[in-house]
């Protein structure tokens, strides 16, 4: 697999002063799959903020000592990051903290603004000074600007949403309140729950609620603003129903953890269904079905059930390294495949194998996995992909930045099969995507090129940071 989502957000608001940093720590641990470059936690203790942020995994950044650095409090917001806008630097670690005339706030954001550069230009012209190359800081400053002329932080967020374009699921913590907001399309997931002691928990995925013992309440609606305070939860829906829901379909195929439920749809069931559809559309005469860990496993199970071909564990994942897109260079990605996956020879040797994976982007990772299976003695390899071919860039928070890097833009399915070294290849048909979520309310722009929002003609993943670097005279 060679694709990555960008972030996970987590927030907790307790009814009493306690170790909210510890709760946030476990919540971020459950969201680690959404971002592995950096992480951070900001704690609010009666309006006094303390924070710790750094590059690395949750287990690397936080220890007993670093958690002890964070005071007890009644609120905390946390973030795990994989950068799709802005570089991998400590300055870009989230949550972003801002002090302003009416108070302070900490902001954690999952998504990608398509108009970030334009907003930043306007803010700089009005005197704003930026310290990062992340679009999250842009959101923070837009909210801050509105906060100076509005009576409440929730009013400021609502006003700011009129200016924001693209994907954003965010958690904002002020001195006295916590805000959860989701863009009007609902591109990225966001939900909340409640713990037995009354504490509220907000997270990118429901799996993080379960990890801290919170009971799922519901998803944040597209366009909705939830205000958590001493009075409870207030819902503001002035931005709801402005657009048709367009949740990213790839959340179900790959990004989300299989035990999560997004907008009422089980991620695990979606993946099993994808495998069943593949078996119906691209059957194979084979001896065993295996999945590429982790997101290919449920689809492999579905293919096995629908085809009657036995399911087996043919690839073992080393769980102590990050996903392959964490490495910036192609050679590093290849090296990570070698240490990340190991074939089970006695399962594969002499067998005709159906290999299930969630996608092919460049083809680099798939080619190496196929080579591993050949070396383990696979007689035939029939690869099935639980998503349609990637043909277009994503501008809503996924690391697919240009068509030049997408193998399906340059080669036919037969040519791709030859390039990666498989005997046959089949993709999930585009027209069957709706069966994964039993709805048409999803974004599949990376597959069909139909973008729900207006996209600047020169927009690329690196456009935001590239333009800023040019201004600052930084060599790229």
What does each of the following model-derived ranges do?
Residues 161, 176, 213-215, 219, ...:
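PRPP-dependent phosphoribosyltransferase catalytic core
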């Amino acid at each position: 697999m060679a694709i990555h989502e960008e972030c996970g957000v987590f927030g907790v608001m307790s009814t009493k002063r306690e170790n909210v940093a510890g709760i946030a720590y476990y919540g971020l641990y459950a969201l680690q799959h959404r971002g592995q470059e950096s992480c951070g936690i900001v704690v609010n203790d009666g309006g006094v903020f303390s924070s710790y942020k750094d590059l690395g995994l949750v287990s690397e950044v936080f220890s007993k000592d670093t958690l002890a650095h964070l005071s007890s409090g009644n609120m905390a917001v946390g973030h795990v990051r994989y950068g799709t806008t802005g570089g991998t630097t400590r300055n870009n670690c989230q949550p972003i903290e801002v002090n302003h005339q009416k108070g302070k706030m900490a902001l954690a954001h999952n998504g990608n603004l398509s108009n970030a550069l334009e907003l930043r230009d306007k803010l700089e012209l009005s005197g704003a000074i930026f310290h990062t190359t992340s679009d999250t800081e842009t959101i923070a400053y837009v909210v801050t600007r509105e906060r100076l002329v509005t009576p409440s932080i929730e009013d400021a967020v609502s006003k700011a949403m009129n200016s924001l374009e693209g994907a954003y699921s965010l958690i904002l913590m002020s001195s006295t309140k916590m805000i959860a907001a989701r863009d009007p399309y609902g591109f990225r997931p966001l939900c909340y729950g409640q713990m037995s002691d009354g504490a509220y928990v907000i997270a990118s995925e429901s799996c993080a609620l379960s990890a801290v013992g919170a009971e799922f309440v519901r998803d944040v609606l597209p366009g909705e603003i939830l205000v958590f305070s001493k009075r409870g939860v207030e819902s503001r829906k002035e931005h709801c129903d402005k657009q048709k829901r367009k949740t990213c379909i790839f959340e179900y195929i790959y990004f989300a953890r299989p035990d999560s439920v997004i907008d009422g749809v089980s991620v695990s069931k979606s993946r099993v269904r994808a495998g069943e559809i593949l078996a119906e559309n691209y059957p194979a005469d084979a001896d065993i079905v295996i999945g590429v860990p982790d997101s290919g496993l449920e689809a492999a199970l579905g293919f096995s059930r629908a085809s009657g071909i036995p399911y087996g564990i043919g690839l073992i994942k080393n769980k102590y390294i990050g996903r392959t897109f964490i490495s910036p260079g192609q050679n590093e990605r290849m090296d990570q495949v070698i240490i990340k996956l190991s074939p089970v020879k006695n399962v594969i040797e002499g067998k005709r194998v159906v290999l299930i994976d969630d996608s092919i982007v460049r083809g680099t990772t798939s080619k190496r996995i196929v080579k591993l299976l050949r070396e383990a003695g696979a007689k035939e390899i029939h690869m099935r992909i639980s998503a349609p071919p990637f043909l277009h860039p994503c501008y809503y928070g996924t690391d697919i930045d240009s068509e030049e890097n997408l193998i399906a833009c340059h080669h036919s399915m037969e040519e791709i099969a030859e390039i990666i070294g498989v005997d046959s290849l089949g993709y999930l048909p585009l027209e069957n995507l709706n069966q994964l979520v039993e709805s048409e309310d999803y974004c599949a722009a990376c597959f069909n090129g139909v973008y729900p929002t207006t996209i600047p003609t020169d927009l690329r993943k690196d456009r935001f940071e590239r333009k800023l670097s040019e201004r600052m005279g930084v060599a790229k």
